[in-house]
């Protein structure tokens, strides 16, 4: 359930002693399918637990999501179509089934198809006279108004929603909140706009969570980010948890927070904290359950369970709380098996007290790791398992009267309590008021009364002053859900803000986040000052005390600063109040007032000023004060000035506004100072930064020192290349030609410098004869780089074709995909003729892979050297053990795939490329062509990652056209780029990561 690199852990204890390949590491399982009865015998559970088959094919097909209704029946979305959706207007073969155990033997003896004709349904929630379900391309309310067990009304609530890019990352995990909203996960890679009938609208790309009203009226985003969340649950305090692939297996969601995702920045406040620091040996986590019941041994109370579809296990974590923050510890796996086809995609706690597991029983689970049309994908087998302890179960759920439903609000079983609450609010309605009033001090009764509009201010105040922390916590949540506060209600929240119980305090902070006002800045800043530690939260390593509360405080303070007049009132705050707290929160406020405030704070700021300067440059009304501050503050540190200028430049591009004269003047002085010859360890960096600033400003006064740099063989090669690049922007073509002709003509010129000249000169007619000679005399590997550079501009493309036509360069260059993509349209027919009947010398990738595998198995590799090769060849884009870039998928667990598969992924990266990692061809209005992976839109600019993994911000106004490709940004020439020894070393290093 993840992106291209899906790597799992070894099987572990269940098969630890077995020789041969690990069957649980294979993307395509090598074993044969088992019958349900045979599979049942493979499960390993703790002592006292029993697993039963609740349902299986042909009763159901592939189960996706499950949910219980008020009668204790299990609703499940079942698919035959996955992973290919049926075409619009075509009836699908998928369905929603209702499973019921009528005789109490633990097996579904009554299976009804409630709705069919669906199209890869995932999220499901039984509601009133029917069910709310996602089925491509809408979220539907399917209603049975005549009681015949089939929907006679199909109402579209929300849609159409995105599914075209990915059918395993859609709208799933429907979970009802205590306030009546329906929460959902939005998965990997799809682009979706969700609109409510009241005009509310959110836009989602890849992992996110959101909530909707069940009548289609309104939508709100809850959190931003995660890679591919699939699975959501609620705990007794009303906190939501999700299971995510790739970023972290478990999060406790903080409303308004940002979570790590591919290529997405946070909101200025940093990413929300994690619950666990381990990965459960896989990036394929699906389904999550918070156990709250009294039928299992006490050690399981408050545990989290997640499905791991790659290792075929149900993992378990115990929770300890640091204040209000859950801190998970990896516990022994709850369920293991010897059958690699077991795929636990969803977990639910039944009202009977049993754990229900949806088993997407399959040889293949990876959506990108294995071609979607692989014949080994099973379409029909699916099972649902039921796990009990010592035969203990709860009696059949009965919510038929208000009194019975109110009684269930005190059940030890979390699912029964939630079902009772929703049934009281949705079905019994006004008839339940009397029964609810009798125990309005119970927090769930209060929630039901609130949803029915019958909770009085006095009853809410009583709840807020209860001796029970759980009741006070829910009082804060109900206060947050109110549309407006009376003065007395605001005072209740202020009391909660200073409560001794951290959960109550955090709920009060969340309530304030929903009611922003300038008057709330002071109390929140004071509360934040008591808890906030200034070190940023780290993805790995030690955690701050109560990090979830700290992050919630930051979000809430940020929201107050968005209120009208909030920044104007800051000078009136107590002098001893730490302004750094407000400064940090202001980084999340995208207004001119925030930008101007941040500029005023710079002289007294502690720590790295980059985030403040970047944010101020993006939003402040007047940027000119930034220049003298930076120039004075870092007078002796030109490199720091350069770094801060580049941050400002990126922000200015995102803003779509040119730099002011004052800032350009400072940057010009900075560039000239950086270009002065010095003898120091950082001289190459100084010269490079100076050249890059001169290029960005097209600084004519820097031309002379840049000429000297470019011609001086004693200068660092990268700095000389930067000088060439800058001169190409500053000088007229004839003057530039005079500078670079000697460089191109010298056989002692370093290869990387020659490449820089070719890239810059490709668009300049005066240099084409020199480019012809350079291309003709270059080694084969460099010829390809030259060809790619030349193809990006019309003059260079002409030169490329003429050189090939003269027989001075091989026509095989024209078979390179990147060359073909960049060639101007007018020259493509000529290129096709020149390349006719030409074959790539290494066209048989399979033979190359086989040869590399044979060589590695014979010789092995040096892992220490492999670490160095990884840093040079891979770390710009890929992360391993938290180190490296995040342009491409992380490589944790890659070693469990085995040598053959890893070699395939390295040497044939274009075999099966996820949409999220396909690069685009960017045609600029100056006729330059670039190749890059679109990372994100940032205001009036787009951020791309180039082929070296470096991010570049390009103004939208400079882009003429973007054309997506089907290819990976990852180079496909590593077999040639790395020596056999280095390739083997890299492979050995990667295979260590299991």
Give residue ranges: language-model regions.
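C-type cytochrome heme c attachment motif
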Residues: 182, 354, 382-383, 448, ...
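Beta-propeller domains with acidic blade repeats across secreted/periplasmic ectodomains
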Residues: 18-405, 415-419, 423, 474, ...
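Sec-exported extracytoplasmic/periplasmic mature domains
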Residues: 119, 144, 214, 410, ...
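Bacterial N-terminal signal peptides that target proteins for export
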Residues: 1-7
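Long, ordered, helix-rich scaffold segments
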Residues: 375, 379-381, 387-869, 887, ...
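Bacterial N-terminal signal peptides
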Residues: 8-16
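C-terminal structured "cap/appendage" subdomains that terminate the fold
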Residues: 361-362, 535, 781-785, 792-801, ...
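C-terminal capping alpha-helices of c-type cytochrome domains
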Residues: 54, 129-131, 137, 831-844, ...
